[in-house]
Amino acid sequence: MLGAVGVVAAAIVLALGAVSPAASGTTLEATYEISVAGVKVGAAEVESRFTDSEYTATIRGKTSGVSRLFSDARALLSGEGRISGDHVLPTSYDLETREGEFETHVRMKMRAGEVTDLLVIPRLSQHPDRIPLEPEHRQEVVDPVAAFLIVTDKPGIGNGRQACKRTIKVFDGWQRYDVRLAYKQTRTVHGSDDAYDGRVVVCTARYVPVAGHRMSLKATRYMVENKRLEVWYAPVKNRRLLVPYRILIGTTYGDLVIVATRFVATDTNARPAVGNQE
C-alpha cells in the first residue's frame, strides 16, 4: 500500500529508542544497511537511549533508485513510551515517508495500549473487500516502533526461547495485524571496530492480518504465506532489553535484509561500549 519505502520503513522501525538527555540511561547508536538480493539499496540511522522506565526513538532511513525495485525515498520515524515490568507502553508514534511525489504521514497518541488520537495521510481507500477497522482494533496494541522492543528478566540474552515466545499486536494507523514470533536458535555473530560482536537470539516471524487489509491483494496473500521472516535480537548493554540486530524478509525479488553494521552502546558519563555487549 505504501510502496517500497513503506516496506523498508516498516522494517527499520524494529530498531528502537531514546529518553531525555537529563535522564541517566544507555544510549544506543546504530547504522543499518538495507539490501535486496545482496545489493545495497539504502541505510538507516538510529539514535536511541533507554532508562529503566522510558524509551524514545529517532530513526532516519533512505533508499536509492539503484534498480527498478527502489526509487529515491526517505523515511523519518519517532516514538516514545514507558517500560513497566516486562511491558512496553508507547505514548506517541510519528511516521513521515516520501517516495517521489507520494507522501505518507502518521501521528498517533496512545495510553495504556489504546490509541487516543490518530491522524493518517492518506486515508484508507474504500474497497468492498477491505476488512473494516473497528474501535477494538485500536485497543491493547503497540505501534511499529515499540513492536519489537523485547524486555527480558535480566541484562543480556537471557532465555532466548522465552524472548521469542510472543504474539505482538500492532496498529500502524492503517492496519491492525499480529506478528507471531517463535524461537529458532541462539547464535554468535562476529563484528569488528564498532559493530556488534556477541550472541543473538533468532526468532522466526509470521504476519497475520486482522483488519484494514485486503485479502484480494497479491502482496497481502504473499506476506500471509511468507515463511521466510526472521528477526535477530541483540542485547542492549546493561539493560533488560533486546533490539533487532538483523531483519530478514523474503520477497519475490530476493531477500530483503536489514543488518546493523554499527552498534555502539554508551552508559551516561561512560565511554562507548563496542563489540560484545552482553
Predicted regions and their residues:
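A general, composition-driven signal for non-globular sequence regions
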Residues: A15, A23, V120, R130-E134, ...
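Bacterial N-terminal signal peptides
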Residues: A4-G17
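Extracytoplasmic beta-rich ectodomain segments of secreted or membrane-anchored proteins
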Residues: P135-W174
